[in-house]
Regions:
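RNase H-like, metal-dependent nuclease domains and their acidic two-metal-ion catalytic environment used
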Residues: 1-42, 49, 53, 67-135
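Short, surface-exposed amphipathic charged segments that create phosphate/polyanion-binding patches used
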Residues: 51-61
């Protein structure tokens, strides 16, 4: 099970970002397995929008980069090439301009980037944890 797998790795992780239809259930399963509630962030619409905006700002400022890969096969490269900003009320989130495209890889790295920023804000010196898991 995913909750078991993540709970075992919690000691090396600063944040677990969960999103999607089962996010709240996964959060409960993780806390039931001893992962502190502050370590699990459920990406509601506000968190999702913040993640998309933070990632775009990171790319534009040069803080975010992606190693060169075979861009015909790299799912993140494909998602970035097809990325569009879709309106979500007064904000926006990622969408795909390709008929069969998917924005999911871009959403995942956006959430990971925000999770890493959140971890830095909390001054990780006390724990030394460096990873952020996105599910």
């Amino acid at each position: 099970r995913l909750a078991d797998w993540l709970a075992v790795r919690w000691g090396d992780t600063d944040r677990i970002m969960v999103a999607g239809s089962g996010a709240v259930l996964l959060q409960k399963a993780l806390t039931d397995r001893g992962v502190p509630g502050r370590g699990v962030v459920v990406a509601d619409t506000g968190v999702y929008v913040e993640a998309c905006q933070a990632f775009l700002e990171g790319v534009r400022s040069g803080v975010v980069s992606h190693p060169r890969a075979d861009s015909r096969r790299d799912m993140l490269d494909i998602a970035v090439r097809s990325a569009v900003q879709k309106r979500k009320g007064s904000a926006w989130g990622w969408g795909s301009s390709f008929k069969d495209g998917s924005e999911v890889p871009l959403e995942a790295v956006s959430l990971a980037f925000l999770g890493a920023k959140m971890a830095r804000r909390k001054r990780r010196e006390r724990s030394g944890r460096k990873r952020v898991s996105v599910v």
